[in-house]
């Protein structure tokens, strides 16, 4: 378990306008019951959801903000947001990337969500000086898949190596986060061909239906789950 490894599990969310680090079972169940009625909260939305006393599900960006306020230097999530496909026309780029460029928190994940443009996402991270570390891998994990056709910026093979890099970065005044990409366990990974076909279809449907902005990711993930007969959701849960 997480505790046996020396860490403390603490789910981050906004409950009744309070930024919370560590939720009770009842609070987690509340968010589950409320479902899509819970506001998706990124940096832009955070003050308004808190001021209105609402419940909020935090993105990577707002989770980083709350973690930093609480003195937490590392957290885990399924996958970071990034540059959406077609962003050269829409400018649809997740606020997660700017938060990673500015906030001193390390995000451990299974790479960027594979519904995104992984190539442009890696380029964006490079431009803003965000290290993209592959944990025991040189290939960038792609959320549902263990590999992709893109590389991480550096491979590190132990937690101690990563911790030393974090310390040196921040002690040197190099503000901003780090991404640690840890591939999904092999037994839960999906074949690239099948998941990419489902993603391509979901992206096309989103364009046809005019789904844009913060609604894009929930729509695409839900549609990919439908197109894969629930297999992608099973993989997502394992992340």
Residue ranges and their predicted role:
Residues 9-14, 50, 56, 74-79, ...:
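General beta-strand structural signal in soluble alpha/beta enzymes
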């Amino acid at each position: 378990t997480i505790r046996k490894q020396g860490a403390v599990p603490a789910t981050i969310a906004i409950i009744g306008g309070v930024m919370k680090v560590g939720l009770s079972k009842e609070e987690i169940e509340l968010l589950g019951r409320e479902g899509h009625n819970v506001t998706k909260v990124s940096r832009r939305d955070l003050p308004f959801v808190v001021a209105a006393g609402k419940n909020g599900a935090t993105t990577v960006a707002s989770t980083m903000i709350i973690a930093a306020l609480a003195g937490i230097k590392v957290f885990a999530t399924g996958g970071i947001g990034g540059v959406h496909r077609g962003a050269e026309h829409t400018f649809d780029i997740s606020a997660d990337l700017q938060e990673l460029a500015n906030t001193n928190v390390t995000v451990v994940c299974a790479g960027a969500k594979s519904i995104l443009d992984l190539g442009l996402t890696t380029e964006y991270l490079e431009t803003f000086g965000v290290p993209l570390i592959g944990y025991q891998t040189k290939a960038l994990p792609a959320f549902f898949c263990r590999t992709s056709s893109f590389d991480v910026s550096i491979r590190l093979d132990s937690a101690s190596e990563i911790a030393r890099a974090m310390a040196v970065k921040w002690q040197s005044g190099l503000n901003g986060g780090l991404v640690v990409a840890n591939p999904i366990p092999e037994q839960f990974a999906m074949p690239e061909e099948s998941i990419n076909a489902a993603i391509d279809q979901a992206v096309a449907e989103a364009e046809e239906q005019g789904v844009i902005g913060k609604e894009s990711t929930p729509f695409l993930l839900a549609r990919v789950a439908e197109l894969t007969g629930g297999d992608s959701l099973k993989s997502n849960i394992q992340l």
